[in-house]
């Protein structure tokens, strides 16, 4: 009884000092447990993430080599958020955003806020102000590598300033994390890859900006270009692989593959066919694809064209796949196998 009284007194004191709701039992409010998500634009990746998309109120890191599809994936998330009336912002530290390409991916440019800051401090101050407003649903920072500290910009070209960017990111993330959760804003950090010199064992790859982002991120996605898509002799897109390296909301290490078509983005119809064949929703006999005894076409490209002309069948297949999401998720985890290219990079 003394313990209960002491606990009640402590809880009352905390609420008087910091306000009502500053401490509570976890099961007291159901909405505390439920997490809102925003689709990624890729059905297979939504399933692999285990919660139907990228989580709101959390930090997400997308990293990979150059031209692997990092910004494309982030722009798809913005487009999906805008479809549901969300407010989005893009911090273009690289000064490289192509508005024409963004529009082709479905981004509403009239309702997208963009900032092109001069320094890393300025970029992160703008990020903090937007997050604290509580009015932004998705905020993308492109990229961590381009967040150059003011001291580096003001200094000479040959000045050695070790750890400056890592300290900047560490301080910013300490300040941002609580605000991001309270405002239910998803912040996506796009990051680049660097090579560690003298690594004999394990992967020599690492991401820029120190280790802080690896710890604070709830989801980390490793995106790679694994091949080219050709139409006769012309390259029209990339085959892309995404691995969920870290996931605080569902089992990680699931791996998915999809096509990114130039000028179009993620090929949703191609995903429907590939996932459909995996779970048996779409039948494949030789080079012919069929669904519910109806032939979709000979060859993958013809089947995609058929679904493009018959969106109602594409919607039917998508509904069937979402109903089999659990089965697909298990298969994606098995496909990833024991292959773990991250080794010491996974937190």
From Swiss-Prot:
Keywords: ATP-binding, Cytoplasm, DNA damage, DNA recombination, DNA repair, DNA-binding, Nucleotide-binding, SOS response. Belongs to the RecA family. One of its GO terms (molecular function) is damaged DNA binding. InterPro entries: AAA+_ATPase (IPR003593), DNA_recomb/repair_RecA (IPR013765), DNA_recomb/repair_RecA_CS (IPR020584), P-loop_NTPase (IPR027417), RecA-like_C (IPR049261), RecA-like_N (IPR049428), RecA_ATP-bd (IPR020588), RecA_C_sf (IPR023400). ATP binds at residues 64-71. GO terms for cellular component: cytosol. This is Protein RecA. Can catalyze the hydrolysis of ATP in the presence of single-stranded DNA, the ATP-dependent uptake of single-stranded DNA by duplex DNA, and the ATP-dependent hybridization of homologous single-stranded DNAs. It interacts with LexA causing its activation and leading to its autocatalytic cleavage. PANTHER family: MITOCHONDRIAL DNA REPAIR PROTEIN RECA HOMOLOG-RELATED (PTHR45900:SF1), RECA (PTHR45900). One of its GO terms (biological process) is DNA repair. CDD domains: RecA (cd00983). The keyword Protein biosynthesis does not apply. It is found in: Cytoplasm. It comes from Bartonella henselae (strain ATCC 49882 / DSM 28221 / CCUG 30454 / Houston 1) (Rochalimaea henselae). Pfam families: RecA, RecA_C. The keyword DNA-binding applies.
């Amino acid at each position: 009884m003394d313990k209960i009284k002491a606990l009640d007194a402590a809880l009352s004191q905390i609420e008087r000092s910091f306000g009502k709701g500053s401490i509570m039992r976890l099961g007291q409010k159901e909405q505390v447990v439920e997490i809102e998500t925003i689709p990624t634009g890729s059905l297979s990746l939504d399933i692999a993430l285990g919660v139907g998309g990228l989580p709101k109120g959390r930090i997400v890191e997308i990293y990979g080599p150059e031209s692997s599809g990092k910004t494309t994936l982030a722009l798809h998330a913005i487009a999906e958020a805008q479809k549901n009336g969300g407010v989005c912002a893009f911090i273009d530290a690289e000064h490289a955003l192509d508005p024409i390409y963004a529009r082709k991916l479905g981004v509403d440019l009239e309702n997208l806020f963009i900032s092109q800051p001069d320094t890393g401090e300025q970029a992160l101050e703008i990020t903090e102000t937007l997050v604290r407003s509580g009015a932004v649903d998705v905020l993308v920072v492109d990229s961590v590598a381009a967040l150059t500290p003011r001291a580096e910009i003001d200094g000479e070209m040959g000045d050695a300033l070790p750890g400056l960017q890592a300290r900047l990111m560490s301080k910013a993330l300490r300040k941002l994390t609580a605000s991001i959760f309270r405002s239910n804003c998803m912040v996506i950090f796009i990051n680049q890859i660097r090579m560690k010199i003298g690594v004999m064992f394990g992967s020599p790859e690492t991401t820029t900006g120190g280790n802080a982002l690896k710890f604070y991120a709830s989801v980390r996605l490793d995106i790679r270009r694994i091949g080219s898509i050709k139409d006769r002799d012309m390259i029209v897109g990339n085959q892309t692989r995404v691995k969920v390296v870290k996931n605080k909301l569902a089992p990680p290490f699931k791996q998915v593959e999809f096509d990114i078509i130039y000028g179009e983005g993620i090929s949703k119809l191609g995903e429907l066919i590939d996932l459909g064949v995996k779970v048996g929703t779409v039948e494949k006999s030789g080079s012919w694809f069929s669904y519910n005894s109806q032939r979709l076409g000979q060859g993958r490209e013809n089947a995609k064209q058929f679904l493009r002309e018959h969106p109602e069948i594409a919607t039917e297949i998508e509904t069937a796949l979402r109903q089999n999401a659990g089965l697909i998720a298990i298969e994606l985890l098995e496909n990833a196998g024991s292959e773990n290219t991250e080794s010491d990079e996974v937190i």
